[in-house]
Amino acid sequence: MWIGVISLFPDMFRAITDFGVTGRAVKRGLLDINYWNPRDFAHDKHRTVDDRPYGGGPGMLMMVQPLRDAIQAAKQAAGDDVKVIYLSPQGKKLTQSGVTELARCKKLILVAGRYEGIDERIIQSDIDEEWSVGDYVLSGGELPAMTLVDAVSRLVPGVLGDMASAEQDSFTDGLLDCPHYTRPESLDGVVVPDVLLSGNHEYIRRWRLKQSLGRTWQRRPELLDNLALTDEQAKLLAQYVQELNAEQQ
């Protein structure tokens, strides 16, 4: 199985390529793991890989150009029939059935984010699927990517001595995150939502909360079952659903 990894810290993956079941699979040629560091694609002398988010707020996002160039380089190396995965708390929760689904792929590219995440337009244009390893926060996507590699590799023929072993293997406010955007303002004809450029912090707060509620309702509705929505949250979620229905008509 061919796996490409997009990471600012590729050396972290020695934990799985040098040890254990996955390490043996690499040595035997059953796993071919390759790396692309966005920092190698930065154009300035400081090799900058982060940028400020539109709309303000704490933290930074991964800079669009180095990240996108790294993904494109990995795609070119992979050739046809490669699936690009972004490890993200906003993704589908990784379960064994999901692992089995991904193990059927001959080639995967895993994008390990850092900082507060990546530009939403990169997710829309360059990412095929988002997967999450759980409802908690990590410092980056490297550990989730390693988790996915480890889980998927167990289903690659020959990695385990006995396939029966594999067959027998047994959020801060409770909402998914809202979409994020950084420079450029227009990417492939898709522009940053006007509200994030308005400078009105209250409008931005309400937009982000509404998007967070709506995304949770669409992707992980069971999370809402455990929440007692405030009047504001209930109203914003109703607006999101109404707007979505209007768009689909």
Swiss-Prot record:
GO terms for cellular component: cytosol. Transmembrane segments: none annotated. GO terms for biological process: tRNA N1-guanine methylation. It is found in: Cytoplasm. GO terms for molecular function: tRNA (guanine(37)-N1)-methyltransferase activity. The keyword Methyltransferase applies. S-adenosyl-L-methionine binds at residues 113, 133-138. It is an enzyme of class 2 (transferase). InterPro entries: Alpha/beta_knot_MTases, tRNA_m1G_MeTrfase_C_sf, tRNA_m1G_MeTrfase_TrmD, tRNA_m1G_MTases_N, tRNA_MeTrfase_TRMD/TRM10. Coiled coil: none annotated. The keyword Transport does not apply. It catalyses: guanosine(37) in tRNA + S-adenosyl-L-methionine = N(1)-methylguanosine(37) in tRNA + S-adenosyl-L-homocysteine + H(+). Keywords: Cytoplasm, Methyltransferase, S-adenosyl-L-methionine, Transferase, tRNA processing. Its EC number is 2.1.1.228. HAMAP family: TrmD. Homodimer. Belongs to the RNA methyltransferase TrmD family. Specifically methylates guanosine-37 in various tRNAs. This is tRNA (guanine-N(1)-)-methyltransferase. It comes from Tolumonas auensis (strain DSM 9187 / NBRC 110442 / TA 4).
